[in-house]
């Protein structure tokens, strides 16, 4: 029995303990709907075809569902279609009726974690995982933001994902992280929060090119949780990246990634069909 969660039941959120023992099937999942912050400061989603709500997918059982039904008694448990990188699935989700949301504040991104991330009021550092052209600093220098990225943590590993090239552009593809059970490498940066503004613009977040996501990263024998990265929204069949973009990736890979993975990534890019 699959359950889609989008708010306080997600990893590292205050009600996640209610899912103790439930295996996470997908960290990156979405349903058609609209996400809100209630007048009590809590997340609530209503079903709608006009937008997406992002969350996680878990394998649960009847006993856990009965417990959650009691906890979320003010919500309706509905069967929903869930989009994941592994294909479409059907799951339950706890949602509210649209007419209950009149006084709520809509969350434009559809992602509770991202909403909380952007609302932060402190100036704590941000950890960011780059797997494509942001492994290289050439465009950082051009934009005058290279000082933000001057002290990377270093090469890093992400389990459960693969680097793919699913974003199509007129001159070729751009990189993406796909949750397919693989293993990939990239660069982990420690940044001031203001660097997020540059990254959001570069990744085309407002244009719905990439979306922010938060993943677990291993670097230097340490696990970093809730690390910012960016995922392609409209994934297409893979084609080869253009030469100038591949050069950026290769420069970063040669500098930070393991030689074996760097070579594997180069071979993979060269194996993709050209436009």
Positions of predicted regions on the chain:
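Glycine-aromatic micro-motifs
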Residues: 1-275
